[in-house]
Amino acid sequence: MASSSNTMEFEEDDSTVTQTSLPTTTSVLDKSRSLFGNSAVISTPARDSTPDGHIVDSSVITKSSVIIEAEDEPDVAADVTALDKEKAEDEPQCSAGKDAKSGESMNDSEKSESPIEEGEGETFEKKIISMDTSDDKLDIAESISVSNDTEKPEENEEKVVGDEDEEDIDDVQEDDEDEAPKKKTKKAVSTSDDDDLHEDDSPKGGSVSDEKEEPENEDDTEEPENEVEVESPVKEQADSGEPIENVNDDKASEPGVGEISQDSVDDSQKIGLDSKSPDGESEANEENQESQSSSRSTRRAKRVSATVSSTPSSNTPRRGGRGQKSEVNADETKTPIVSNSTPRRGRSSRGGDRDEVIDPTENVVGDSGVEETSPRKGRSRRSVATEDTSVTEEVENTEHPTEEETPKQGRGRRSAASSSATSSAVPTPRSTRGRGRKSQANEENLQEKETEDPTKTHDTNQAKSTRTPRGRRSNADAETMESVEAEKVETPTSSRRSTRAKPPAKSAPVTPAVTNKRTTVRGRKKQGSITEDPIEEADETIEETLPQKKGRGAAKSAPSSSKKSAEYDPYDLDTEMEHHPEPLKNIHMEVHNFGAVKYAKLGNSESKYSMTEKAAESRIAELQSSPAAKNRRSLADMTPGKDKMKHRVSSVGTSGRRSRAKKEEEHHENDIEMEDAPATATPASSNRGRKRKSEASDIKTPPAKKEPVIPLKNLSDEDQLLVDHPQDDNEPHAPGARVYAVFQKMFYPAVVLSERDGLGRYKVQFTVDNVIKDVPNSGIIPLRALSPGKTAVYNESDVRLDSGPNDISAAEWKKGKLTISIMDEDGEPTDEVKVVDWYDVSFDHSEWRDYVKSKDQSATAIVTSNITTISEATRARKPTTVSNQAKPKGRKKKGVDLVSSRGGSASPAEEEEKLLPMNEEAIGKNIFTGKVFMLTSANRSNSASVPSMFKKKNLMNFITQNGGIVTEQLNSFQERYSNYEPLLISDTYYRTHKYLAALARGVPCVNNTWLQACGEQGKCVDYTDYVLPAGASIFDESQDMPAPKNPSELLKGTTIYVHSTHSAREVTQTGPGGTFIEIWKPILELLGADVVDGDWETLDETGLKFDVVLVDGTFRDEVMEYADTIGASRVTSEWVIQTIILGKAPEPNAHPKFDPYRLHHRTRH
């Protein structure tokens, strides 16, 4: 009351100003005053005058009654106007929206009467004054004034919009929203708009009543937050001015009057009941103030008006005309979304083709308060557009006097929609999509949640009062109600409660919640974000039940929402299964070391060991020896997240289980990392999956090693000859070489596919079945190694090999023809001779045992094994001298004739195994004094076939203990030990550098058995019978050639040029070896040849002369051409070796191996 008195004083000041400026408005205000002062009386005759029982008719009748009163009773109207002015001044102070509405009403009256137009212009001045004086008011009045400030520009904008087209409404709304903070500019615009609107006669009268009543609807006690938040919707109303005015022409005027009356009644009940004066004028003033505030609220957010629903008893008489709007105002305080937004939204949805303004006629007819609340749809411009379209249809049917009210209502609807959107926690997009039942249900749920306690107390009272408007709404437009409720998603329940007409005293506390929501309404996104998350699930579950409740009274909606809220359980597995983790069924927990816990999902199999059985089955399938390897599935296929190998499973049931498990894994993906080890062979485990993945990679390597069938290389005749006949027999086999590889104690024809690997094995492919296998060097017999007299197998019968392929001709060699003789039952060769292909014959392992043994003991090629130059042997061992001290006598105690020549702690048995026997009498005699020995690398200690006493280490110890000297340096024979007799000890002849160098020097090569004989006899015996041959002739491999007697005379008088571009040194056991030139140049000099040096690039310039050029595979063609020009022979190292073996120099072209161009390792430049 104190606040109202203050406003009255301020209003009096304003009224004085306005009275001086507005003489004509006084009559209009008197008319409105008569209407507002005798609100109950006016509403009653209005309903009586309206033959239609509808709210629209009642509202229209009230307007008509007001107009009639203004015409018939000008004096009374004048008196009323004075009071109205005072209250109008008071109301703008409390709420700026009230002045805006009064200005619009003045404009409406001016449309009917020209003098009213001037008054309306002055009403805008009053508004300005109220805006300025709003600072002196109480906090509540200040909040209302803030809303009034926003409403004033909104009214101006509405009027401007009335002049503009409906399409411009959206643009004007946006501009108004931008101008909202600028109050002065908006006020000026509003005054100019009001002047324009004064020109319209008929709509002004209705608008005047509406404006006055709407401010009455706004409660001075309503929270300022709501009003402030309402500003954006008010701007939207201003934007939709023109189409709204058209709506006012038809129906907006009528609903505006009805709404004003009802708002005034409601406000009077809320605030006016306390501050009612005995005079109807005071009540009218209070009602006018409330109506103005309510209109402001409706413009900004008509939720507040809807929530402030008046008590059903006091508002019942006015519901016919104005009481309904008062209900709307009451609803606006809380949540007018359902009632107001429903008709507008339904109308907008129904009349999608209509103008921007929503149907004010039907909505007003059904329930003017509902219409105002429907602006909540104004949340989104979409809803505004729908409202505008519906209003345009109504404009066609409506009369001009109601034009201004409808725009206010339209904008108010927008504001109300926005406020309702904010108030309701339900997401905006869903409500708008659901345009109907779903949104209603969501709104109901939200309303119940927000106002469960306060609303429950008022539900009974509201149910009575609101049922009537709800029925009217359904009668007017059930579909519109549903659609409006859908858009108002968040506040439908509050609006319904407001329609039920809760007591005004209680509606005021409800408004703060609504206002907070209104603020969020401006940010529709904010509103959606707040409400969507908690209520999405509830909306989905309630969608089906909502359509049934939407059509009926609000009484059902509130209990339904409470019921649903009570039923809603976020932990309910039935309703929240999609948002819930997978139920812990078939989950097995295992506790491992260090407290580690693993979870595994068991399969459908009942067996406890189903997982182990499947794992074992898949692993067995990958074994090479398993015949079902191709029909099994590897563990790699079972690992998740990896492309599975396309192994087909023989069992159909297993594949079905596998597919189901896969689907379950895809469907049930949990944040918890669980180990899925079903019997379906598709585990989803993370840890165990990784282990299986690594294990599977190891398991599936054997099948991966099965190389695809590689066709035999089709080499030319020359290339095939070079591959099959390398420069040195000890050189590695080249790819494409034709060989016989061992397989299960038999040698079968095969072709070498790749170079030797790190383990010394060759990858060969058998020609019979194209199987690829890795075979060591000792398991390969080259085709060139075939010798006559060997027994072979041909067509499962034994035959004797007479001759191999002819290597003189490359074409003949490429054919690979073998000559064999058929053997009889006794194993004797017959006269039957056949010529067969090399791949039709196989050999038994027993026939080549000696060859394999020699391969195991043989050294590597001359270019890679034990080849060191005199200058490069840096790691040569120093010769050791044997002490002449006698051995301990204790060694003779066992009475063994053979004693170890080396003292040590080893047992006699071990000494007998490691050391050569030495005659007891010869111990200490140093039988090898004056001799220097060199041991070849062929006697290697790691050779399993060599007896321990013939191992190189033991031989060295035996020699040194008996007075001999062991050296590794080739030059020691002549330089350091020129006075010693040199000997080379070996078990057989070799093609190593040491052996060939010893032959070139004329050093006797003695068998190691000679040392054994010396030890047994206790003296140094003659080694003549133990001298080894020089080697096998290339022309006759069956004959071993003796060592040359005069090696220094073999190449005497021959000038040789050694050429090679390979500068890398070979690494040997004794250290770095020499290059091709460093190896062969000393040997050629020992053989008596004259070796010339020269740069191969300057041979033409220098004109170097030589007889023979010795090259390796890296020779340059320029050197070959130069040799041809000077008539020099071109030979390989094989020519030098054969010279040493044969004891004479063969012809350079006597054998293909002497031709440099046939070297298989030749580097093409």
From Swiss-Prot:
Residues 1-26, 70-578, 608-713, 874-913 are annotated as: Disordered. InterPro entries: BRCT_dom, BRCT_dom_sf, BRCT_p53bp1-like_rpt1, BRCT_p53bp1-like_rpt2, SH3_Hsr9, TP53BP1-like. The keyword Iron-sulfur does not apply. PROSITE patterns: BRCT. It comes from the Eukaryota. Induction: Induced by DNA damage cues including gamma-irradiation, and UV and hydroxyurea treatment. Disruption phenotype: Reduced number of apoptotic cells following gamma-irradiation. In a rad-54 knockdown but not in brc-1 mutant background, restores levels of embryonic survival and chromosomal aberrations in oocytes following gamma-irradiation to almost wildtype. Mutants show slightly reduced levels of egl-1 mRNA expression. SUPFAM superfamilies: BRCT domain. Residues 163-179, 211-230, 280-289, 533-543 have a biased composition (Acidic residues). GO terms for biological process: DNA damage checkpoint signaling; DNA repair; positive regulation of transcription by RNA polymerase II. GO terms for molecular function: histone binding. Residues 16-26, 415-431, 554-563 have a biased composition (Low complexity). Gene3D superfamilies: BRCT domain. SMART domains: BRCT. GO terms for cellular component: nucleus. Residues 98-114, 123-140, 149-162, 397-408, 446-461, 662-671, 694-708 have a biased composition (Basic and acidic residues). Pfam families: BRCT, BRCT_3, SH3_Hsr9. Residues 306-317 have a biased composition (Polar residues). Expressed in germ cells. Keywords: DNA damage, DNA repair, Nucleus. May have a role in DNA double-strand break repair following gamma-irradiation. This is Protein hsr-9. It comes from Caenorhabditis elegans.
